[in-house]
A protein has these predicted regions:
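Active-site beta-strand/loop signature of hydrolases that rely on acidic residues for catalysis
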Residues: 21-28, 56-82, 122, 162, ...
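N-terminal, active-site-proximal structural segment of metallo-dependent hydrolase catalytic domains
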Residues: 9-93, 104-111, 116, 194, ...
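Bacterial N-terminal signal peptides
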Residues: 1-6
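Active-site-proximal beta-strand elements of phosphoester/diester hydrolases
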Residues: 20-42, 131-136, 161, 171-182
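Solvent-exposed loop/turn segments at secondary-structure junctions
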Residues: 28-32, 73-77, 105-109, 127-128, ...
């Protein structure tokens, strides 16, 4: 009887181990912005995209993230992709990332059409399959050439999103990266936030998968628009949650800046870059502030933005 007891009671089913994923938001700064600042004497020549692309790639490879949201990857005035040389630089360093860049004019077709500082998503090819994707507008306007009178062209903000399937387990999750208008237009930024939450809800509610929303929301925690994010019933700010639970390091509490100034000489104030999650456990959060060699060997911050990184489980 004693030998049969475990069978009679039934062995407790083993829980599948949680999958680990390391994600990052990286505002890489469009090449036209860099060129303008250099031409006006606001930034050193090392800031040019052609001089920084290797450093950007080195930072991505060094941090070894599984999925990365890249903001300001395209040139809005020229209407083209602004990632010149980055895929090649990553590959040359042994990193195998797949790319998703969606045009504002043809959202169903990657890498075609005109671009308006569109976000990109890159992911480790050997770990995930991208099974769905699209781009949605946050400002309520599709064609910036037909904007209502008095509305700025940057009202055409968007969110690029993808649905991924982990190859090893079949687990699925959503990944969204966006940029909003920020402090220069608080009312429009608030509407961006409202629309982003609405869009995300409509996408995720269909199958209730874990999801990540990240972006350069260009606002401080004291901004009214930030309250829109805090009111989200589903998603929560990784930084704020860890801060509330007393799990942030003293260095991250004392220095939460996610940007540096145009000259690259010092960090800027505030935290305009965010990661929100739902359905994930948080292992860690950090802002990567290392310098890397530019084309001439000068150590520089590769971009105006620092990578914001979080290790998660689901």
């Amino acid at each position: 009887m004693l030998l049969l007891l475990p069978l009679a009671l039934g062995a407790a089913p083993k829980k599948a181990p949680k999958s680990q994923i390391k994600v990052a938001l990286y505002n890489v700064t469009a090449s036209q912005t860099r060129a303008k600042d250099v031409s006006e004497g606001k930034a050193p020549v090392q800031r040019l995209w052609s001089n920084s692309v290797e450093a950007v790639a080195e930072q991505i490879v060094t941090k070894d993230c599984d999925v990365v949201g890249l903001v300001d990857i395209c040139d809005s005035i020229a209407g083209r992709q602004g990632n010149a040389g980055l895929p090649e630089a990553l590959k040359a360093k042994g990193a195998d990332y797949s790319w998703l860049i969606l045009s504002n004019t043809r959202p169903s077709l990657p890498l075609e059409g005109a671009y308006n500082k569109t976000q990109a998503i890159i992911w480790k090819t050997d770990r995930y399959d991208c099974i769905d994707w699209s781009i949605n507008w946050l400002g309520g306007f599709f064609d910036k050439n037909r904007l209502p009178k008095g509305v700025k062209g940057d009202a055409t903000k968007s969110v690029t999103w993808a649905k991924f399937r982990e190859k090893a387990t079949g687990k699925e999750f959503y990944f969204m990266v966006a940029s909003t208008n920020g402090q220069s237009n608080e009312s429009l930024s608030k509407r961006n936030c409202e629309n982003l939450i609405k869009i995300a809800d409509e996408i995720v509610v269909t199958d209730d998968k874990p999801s990540i929303i990240m972006g350069s929301f260009n606002m401080q925690e004291s901004a009214p628009a930030y309250k829109e994010y805090l009111s989200m019933s589903r998603w929560f700010d990784v930084y704020s949650r860890l801060k509330e639970e007393g799990l942030l390091s003293s260095s991250e509490l004392s220095n939460k800046n996610t940007r540096n100034n145009s000259s690259g000489e010092k960090t800027s104030s505030g935290r305009p870059d965010y990661i929100f999650v739902d359905g994930f456990d948080i292992d860690s959060y950090m802002v990567a502030r290392e310098k890397f060699p530019s084309a001439d060997g000068t150590s520089v911050y590769p971009s105006y933005g620092f990578p914001v990184i979080s290790s998660l489980k689901f």
